[in-house]
Protein backbone atom coordinates (compact mmCIF):
# COMPACT_ATOMS: atom_id res chain seq x y z
CA UNK A 1 0.00 0.00 0.00
CA UNK A 2 2.78 2.55 0.68
CA UNK A 3 3.85 2.43 -2.98
CA UNK A 4 0.32 3.30 -4.14
CA UNK A 5 0.10 6.07 -1.54
CA UNK A 6 3.43 7.54 -2.66
CA UNK A 7 2.38 7.64 -6.33
CA UNK A 8 -1.03 9.04 -5.39
CA UNK A 9 0.59 11.76 -3.26
CA UNK A 10 2.81 12.73 -6.19
CA UNK A 11 -0.28 13.01 -8.38
CA UNK A 12 -1.93 15.22 -5.76
CA UNK A 13 1.10 17.50 -5.55
CA UNK A 14 1.13 17.77 -9.33
CA UNK A 15 -2.57 18.75 -9.27
CA UNK A 16 -3.49 15.78 -11.46
CA UNK A 17 -6.49 15.04 -9.27
CA UNK A 18 -8.04 18.39 -10.13
CA UNK A 19 -8.89 16.91 -13.55
CA UNK A 20 -10.98 14.23 -11.80
CA UNK A 21 -13.24 16.47 -9.71
CA UNK A 22 -16.71 15.31 -10.70
CA UNK A 23 -19.52 16.97 -8.75
CA UNK A 24 -19.48 19.66 -6.06
CA UNK A 25 -15.82 18.97 -5.26
CA UNK A 26 -16.27 15.19 -5.05
CA UNK A 27 -14.36 12.44 -6.86
CA UNK A 28 -15.92 9.28 -8.27
CA UNK A 29 -14.57 6.04 -6.80
CA UNK A 30 -15.72 2.91 -8.64
CA UNK A 31 -15.49 -0.43 -6.83
CA UNK A 32 -15.75 -3.91 -8.31
CA UNK A 33 -14.27 -7.35 -7.87
CA UNK A 34 -12.53 -9.62 -10.34
CA UNK A 35 -10.80 -12.98 -10.38
CA UNK A 36 -7.17 -13.40 -11.39
CA UNK A 37 -6.33 -17.03 -10.56
CA UNK A 38 -8.22 -20.33 -10.70
CA UNK A 39 -7.00 -23.93 -10.65
CA UNK A 40 -8.05 -27.42 -9.64
CA UNK A 41 -4.48 -28.49 -8.82
CA UNK A 42 -2.38 -25.48 -7.77
CA UNK A 43 -3.23 -23.91 -4.41
CA UNK A 44 -1.96 -22.20 -1.28
CA UNK A 45 -3.38 -21.78 2.25
CA UNK A 46 -4.89 -18.43 1.25
CA UNK A 47 -6.84 -19.68 -1.76
CA UNK A 48 -10.60 -19.51 -1.60
CA UNK A 49 -12.18 -22.88 -2.40
CA UNK A 50 -15.40 -23.94 -4.07
CA UNK A 51 -16.73 -27.27 -5.27
CA UNK A 52 -17.05 -27.82 -8.99
CA UNK A 53 -19.93 -29.83 -10.45
CA UNK A 54 -18.07 -33.11 -9.88
CA UNK A 55 -17.26 -32.26 -6.24
CA UNK A 56 -13.75 -31.42 -7.39
CA UNK A 57 -12.28 -28.55 -5.39
CA UNK A 58 -11.52 -25.42 -7.36
CA UNK A 59 -9.03 -22.94 -5.89
CA UNK A 60 -9.19 -19.26 -6.74
CA UNK A 61 -7.96 -15.78 -5.89
CA UNK A 62 -9.89 -12.57 -6.42
CA UNK A 63 -9.34 -8.92 -5.65
CA UNK A 64 -11.51 -5.88 -5.11
CA UNK A 65 -10.40 -2.91 -7.16
CA UNK A 66 -11.06 0.75 -6.49
CA UNK A 67 -10.32 3.37 -9.15
CA UNK A 68 -10.96 7.08 -9.47
CA UNK A 69 -12.92 7.70 -12.66
CA UNK A 70 -14.38 10.60 -14.61
CA UNK A 71 -16.84 10.54 -17.54
CA UNK A 72 -14.61 12.81 -19.63
CA UNK A 73 -11.33 10.92 -19.11
CA UNK A 74 -10.39 7.52 -20.50
CA UNK A 75 -7.62 7.06 -17.92
CA UNK A 76 -8.43 5.83 -14.42
CA UNK A 77 -6.44 6.23 -11.19
CA UNK A 78 -6.29 2.92 -9.28
CA UNK A 79 -5.99 2.78 -5.51
CA UNK A 80 -4.36 -0.17 -3.77
CA UNK A 81 -6.56 -3.23 -4.43
CA UNK A 82 -7.85 -5.47 -1.67
CA UNK A 83 -7.15 -9.22 -2.02
CA UNK A 84 -10.11 -11.54 -1.50
CA UNK A 85 -8.35 -14.49 0.16
CA UNK A 86 -8.59 -16.74 3.18
CA UNK A 87 -6.82 -15.28 6.19
CA UNK A 88 -4.45 -17.31 8.35
CA UNK A 89 -6.29 -20.13 10.07
CA UNK A 90 -9.66 -19.34 8.51
CA UNK A 91 -11.88 -22.08 7.09
CA UNK A 92 -14.45 -19.80 5.43
CA UNK A 93 -13.89 -18.03 2.13
CA UNK A 94 -13.40 -14.30 2.07
CA UNK A 95 -15.98 -12.31 0.10
CA UNK A 96 -16.34 -9.09 -1.85
CA UNK A 97 -18.48 -7.46 0.84
CA UNK A 98 -15.84 -7.95 3.55
CA UNK A 99 -13.11 -6.84 1.17
CA UNK A 100 -15.09 -3.65 0.51
CA UNK A 101 -15.18 -2.86 4.22
CA UNK A 102 -11.39 -3.19 4.41
CA UNK A 103 -10.69 -1.25 1.23
CA UNK A 104 -13.01 1.62 2.13
CA UNK A 105 -11.67 1.86 5.69
CA UNK A 106 -8.07 1.89 4.43
CA UNK A 107 -8.95 4.49 1.79
CA UNK A 108 -10.51 6.80 4.39
CA UNK A 109 -7.57 6.29 6.76
CA UNK A 110 -5.04 7.14 4.04
CA UNK A 111 -7.11 9.99 2.55
CA UNK A 112 -9.12 11.41 5.46
CA UNK A 113 -10.15 14.59 3.65
CA UNK A 114 -10.76 13.24 0.14
CA UNK A 115 -14.42 13.84 -0.86
CA UNK A 116 -15.62 10.61 -2.47
CA UNK A 117 -18.75 9.40 -4.26
CA UNK A 118 -18.66 5.60 -4.40
CA UNK A 119 -20.13 4.05 -7.57
CA UNK A 120 -21.05 0.35 -7.56
CA UNK A 121 -23.41 -2.20 -9.06
CA UNK A 122 -26.64 -3.50 -7.52
CA UNK A 123 -24.87 -6.04 -5.29
CA UNK A 124 -23.69 -3.12 -3.15
CA UNK A 125 -27.17 -1.60 -2.70
CA UNK A 126 -27.76 -3.16 0.72
CA UNK A 127 -28.20 -1.57 4.13
CA UNK A 128 -24.96 -2.75 5.83
CA UNK A 129 -22.84 -1.48 2.94
CA UNK A 130 -24.63 1.87 2.74
CA UNK A 131 -24.23 2.29 6.50
CA UNK A 132 -20.50 1.61 6.10
CA UNK A 133 -20.29 4.34 3.45
CA UNK A 134 -22.18 6.77 5.68
CA UNK A 135 -19.92 6.01 8.66
CA UNK A 136 -16.87 6.80 6.49
CA UNK A 137 -18.43 10.05 5.20
CA UNK A 138 -18.68 8.81 1.62
CA UNK A 139 -21.55 9.54 -0.76
CA UNK A 140 -22.89 6.95 -3.20
CA UNK A 141 -24.46 6.18 -6.57
CA UNK A 142 -25.49 2.51 -6.54
CA UNK A 143 -27.25 0.51 -9.21
CA UNK A 144 -30.56 -1.13 -8.26
CA UNK A 145 -32.71 -3.77 -9.97
CA UNK A 146 -36.41 -4.59 -9.60
CA UNK A 147 -35.71 -8.22 -8.75
CA UNK A 148 -33.62 -7.43 -5.67
CA UNK A 149 -35.30 -4.13 -4.70
CA UNK A 150 -38.96 -4.87 -5.36
CA UNK A 151 -40.38 -2.67 -2.56
CA UNK A 152 -38.21 0.29 -3.58
CA UNK A 153 -39.39 0.15 -7.19
CA UNK A 154 -43.00 -0.26 -6.08
CA UNK A 155 -42.76 2.79 -3.79
CA UNK A 156 -41.11 4.83 -6.54
CA UNK A 157 -43.79 3.99 -9.11
CA UNK A 158 -46.54 4.75 -6.61
CA UNK A 159 -44.99 8.13 -5.76
CA UNK A 160 -44.63 9.02 -9.44
CA UNK A 161 -48.25 8.00 -10.12
CA UNK A 162 -49.40 10.26 -7.28
CA UNK A 163 -47.41 13.20 -8.60
CA UNK A 164 -44.88 13.10 -5.77
CA UNK A 165 -41.90 12.53 -8.06
CA UNK A 166 -40.31 14.51 -10.84
CA UNK A 167 -39.75 13.99 -14.58
CA UNK A 168 -37.47 15.63 -17.12
CA UNK A 169 -36.72 15.07 -20.80
CA UNK A 170 -33.94 16.73 -22.75
CA UNK A 171 -32.42 16.29 -26.18
CA UNK A 172 -28.77 15.32 -26.28
CA UNK A 173 -26.51 18.31 -26.86
CA UNK A 174 -24.37 16.47 -29.42
CA UNK A 175 -26.92 14.21 -31.14
CA UNK A 176 -30.49 15.47 -31.63
CA UNK A 177 -31.65 11.88 -32.33
CA UNK A 178 -31.05 10.96 -28.68
CA UNK A 179 -33.38 11.92 -25.84
CA UNK A 180 -32.52 11.68 -22.14
CA UNK A 181 -35.55 10.84 -20.01
CA UNK A 182 -35.35 11.13 -16.21
CA UNK A 183 -37.77 10.21 -13.45
CA UNK A 184 -36.85 10.58 -9.81
CA UNK A 185 -38.28 10.36 -6.31
CA UNK A 186 -36.58 11.55 -3.14
CA UNK A 187 -36.60 10.19 0.39
CA UNK A 188 -37.69 6.58 -0.12
CA UNK A 189 -36.99 3.64 2.20
CA UNK A 190 -34.30 1.33 0.86
CA UNK A 191 -36.52 -1.68 1.57
CA UNK A 192 -39.19 -2.90 3.99
CA UNK A 193 -36.57 -4.15 6.45
CA UNK A 194 -34.69 -0.84 6.63
CA UNK A 195 -37.32 1.87 6.44
CA UNK A 196 -35.09 4.20 8.46
CA UNK A 197 -32.48 4.17 5.67
CA UNK A 198 -33.64 6.80 3.20
CA UNK A 199 -32.37 7.13 -0.37
CA UNK A 200 -33.19 9.01 -3.56
CA UNK A 201 -34.29 6.95 -6.58
CA UNK A 202 -33.28 7.87 -10.15
CA UNK A 203 -34.74 6.17 -13.24
CA UNK A 204 -33.12 7.02 -16.58
CA UNK A 205 -33.72 6.07 -20.22
CA UNK A 206 -31.54 6.97 -23.17
CA UNK A 207 -33.89 6.88 -26.14
CA UNK A 208 -32.17 6.59 -29.51
CA UNK A 209 -33.27 5.85 -33.08
CA UNK A 210 -32.36 2.15 -32.82
CA UNK A 211 -32.57 1.23 -29.14
CA UNK A 212 -33.48 2.43 -25.68
CA UNK A 213 -31.15 1.90 -22.72
CA UNK A 214 -32.56 1.82 -19.20
CA UNK A 215 -30.73 2.37 -15.89
CA UNK A 216 -31.81 2.82 -12.27
CA UNK A 217 -29.80 4.01 -9.27
CA UNK A 218 -30.12 5.07 -5.67
CA UNK A 219 -28.07 7.94 -4.30
CA UNK A 220 -27.77 10.33 -1.37
CA UNK A 221 -26.84 13.21 -3.68
CA UNK A 222 -29.45 15.92 -4.32
CA UNK A 223 -31.63 15.20 -7.36
CA UNK A 224 -32.83 18.31 -9.20
CA UNK A 225 -33.34 19.24 -12.86
CA UNK A 226 -29.83 20.73 -12.71
CA UNK A 227 -28.10 17.65 -11.24
CA UNK A 228 -29.78 14.52 -12.65
CA UNK A 229 -27.81 14.54 -15.92
CA UNK A 230 -24.49 14.79 -14.08
CA UNK A 231 -25.42 12.07 -11.59
CA UNK A 232 -26.54 9.84 -14.47
CA UNK A 233 -23.14 10.32 -16.11
CA UNK A 234 -21.49 9.33 -12.84
CA UNK A 235 -23.60 6.18 -12.51
CA UNK A 236 -22.96 5.08 -16.08
CA UNK A 237 -19.26 5.80 -15.67
CA UNK A 238 -18.97 2.73 -13.42
CA UNK A 239 -18.25 0.55 -16.47
CA UNK A 240 -14.76 2.09 -16.58
CA UNK A 241 -13.63 -0.22 -13.79
CA UNK A 242 -14.75 -3.21 -15.87
CA UNK A 243 -13.54 -2.11 -19.30
CA UNK A 244 -10.78 0.47 -18.83
CA UNK A 245 -9.38 -1.37 -15.79
CA UNK A 246 -10.00 -5.13 -15.56
CA UNK A 247 -10.38 -5.77 -19.29
CA UNK A 248 -7.19 -3.80 -19.96
CA UNK A 249 -5.30 -5.65 -17.22
CA UNK A 250 -6.39 -9.05 -18.53
CA UNK A 251 -6.39 -8.59 -22.31
CA UNK A 252 -4.18 -5.64 -23.22
CA UNK A 253 -0.73 -6.89 -22.27
CA UNK A 254 -0.63 -6.73 -18.46
CA UNK A 255 -1.55 -10.45 -18.14
CA UNK A 256 -3.24 -10.09 -14.74
CA UNK A 257 -4.54 -13.67 -14.94
CA UNK A 258 -1.18 -15.24 -15.84
CA UNK A 259 0.20 -17.56 -13.17
CA UNK A 260 3.77 -16.30 -12.84
CA UNK A 261 4.18 -18.54 -9.78
CA UNK A 262 1.68 -19.24 -7.05
CA UNK A 263 3.94 -19.69 -4.04
CA UNK A 264 2.92 -21.05 -0.66
CA UNK A 265 1.84 -17.78 0.97
CA UNK A 266 1.00 -14.47 -0.71
CA UNK A 267 2.94 -14.61 -3.99
CA UNK A 268 -0.15 -14.60 -6.23
CA UNK A 269 -1.52 -11.50 -4.49
CA UNK A 270 1.88 -9.79 -4.65
CA UNK A 271 2.02 -10.25 -8.42
CA UNK A 272 -1.50 -8.83 -8.72
CA UNK A 273 -0.46 -5.82 -6.61
CA UNK A 274 2.61 -5.20 -8.77
CA UNK A 275 0.54 -5.45 -11.95
CA UNK A 276 -1.95 -2.88 -10.62
CA UNK A 277 0.92 -0.62 -9.52
CA UNK A 278 2.45 -0.70 -13.01
CA UNK A 279 -0.99 0.07 -14.43
CA UNK A 280 -1.33 3.07 -12.09
CA UNK A 281 1.99 4.53 -13.25
CA UNK A 282 1.07 3.98 -16.91
CA UNK A 283 -2.35 5.58 -16.46
CA UNK A 284 -0.88 8.70 -14.86
CA UNK A 285 1.74 8.99 -17.60
CA UNK A 286 -0.90 8.58 -20.31
CA UNK A 287 -2.92 11.36 -18.70
CA UNK A 288 -0.16 13.84 -17.89
CA UNK A 289 3.17 13.21 -19.66
CA UNK A 290 3.54 14.61 -23.22
CA UNK A 291 6.70 12.57 -23.83
CA UNK A 292 4.97 9.34 -22.80
CA UNK A 293 1.98 10.21 -24.99
CA UNK A 294 4.25 10.85 -28.00
CA UNK A 295 6.17 7.62 -27.38
CA UNK A 296 2.93 5.67 -27.17
CA UNK A 297 1.60 7.22 -30.37
CA UNK A 298 4.88 6.49 -32.16
CA UNK A 299 4.79 2.83 -31.14
CA UNK A 300 1.02 2.43 -31.74
CA UNK A 301 0.21 0.38 -28.62
CA UNK A 302 1.34 -0.27 -25.06
CA UNK A 303 2.70 -3.67 -26.14
CA UNK A 304 4.74 -2.05 -28.89
CA UNK A 305 6.03 0.55 -26.45
CA UNK A 306 7.01 -2.08 -23.89
CA UNK A 307 8.84 -4.15 -26.51
CA UNK A 308 10.85 -1.11 -27.61
CA UNK A 309 11.60 -0.18 -24.00
CA UNK A 310 12.96 -3.65 -23.26
CA UNK A 311 15.15 -3.53 -26.35
CA UNK A 312 16.58 -0.11 -25.46
CA UNK A 313 17.28 -1.14 -21.87
CA UNK A 314 19.32 -4.06 -23.19
CA UNK A 315 21.48 -2.18 -25.69
CA UNK A 316 21.64 1.48 -24.61
CA UNK A 317 23.20 3.36 -21.72
CA UNK A 318 20.54 5.79 -20.52
CA UNK A 319 21.06 8.65 -18.10
CA UNK A 320 17.40 9.40 -17.36
CA UNK A 321 13.80 8.76 -18.42
CA UNK A 322 13.69 11.81 -20.66
CA UNK A 323 16.51 10.36 -22.71
CA UNK A 324 14.64 7.06 -22.99
CA UNK A 325 11.44 8.74 -24.18
CA UNK A 326 13.33 10.80 -26.76
CA UNK A 327 14.88 7.57 -28.06
CA UNK A 328 11.45 5.94 -28.22
CA UNK A 329 10.07 8.89 -30.18
CA UNK A 330 12.97 9.81 -32.46
CA UNK A 331 15.15 6.70 -32.42
CA UNK A 332 18.50 6.21 -30.65
CA UNK A 333 20.81 8.95 -31.90
CA UNK A 334 24.47 7.95 -31.82
CA UNK A 335 25.55 11.38 -30.61
CA UNK A 336 23.22 11.46 -27.62
CA UNK A 337 23.02 7.79 -26.58
CA UNK A 338 25.86 5.38 -25.97
CA UNK A 339 25.49 1.72 -26.81
CA UNK A 340 26.11 -0.59 -23.88
CA UNK A 341 29.14 -2.72 -24.77
CA UNK A 342 29.80 -4.06 -21.27
Language model region names:
Residues 90-149:
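Domain-level cores of phosphate- or acyl-group-handling catalytic modules
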Residues 68-70, 83, 122, 142-146, ...:
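Short, structured patches in soluble enzyme cores that scaffold and shape functional sites
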Amino acid sequence: RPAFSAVFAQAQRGKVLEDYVFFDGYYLLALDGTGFFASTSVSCPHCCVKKAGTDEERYYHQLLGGVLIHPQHKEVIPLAPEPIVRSDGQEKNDCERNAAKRLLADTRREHPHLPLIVVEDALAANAPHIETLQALDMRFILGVKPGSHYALFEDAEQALAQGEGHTLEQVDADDARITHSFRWVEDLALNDSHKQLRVHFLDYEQIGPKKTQHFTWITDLPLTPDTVYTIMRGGRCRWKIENETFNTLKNQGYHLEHNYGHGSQYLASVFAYLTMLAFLVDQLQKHTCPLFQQALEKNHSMRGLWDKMRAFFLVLTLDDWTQLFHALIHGPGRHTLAYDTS
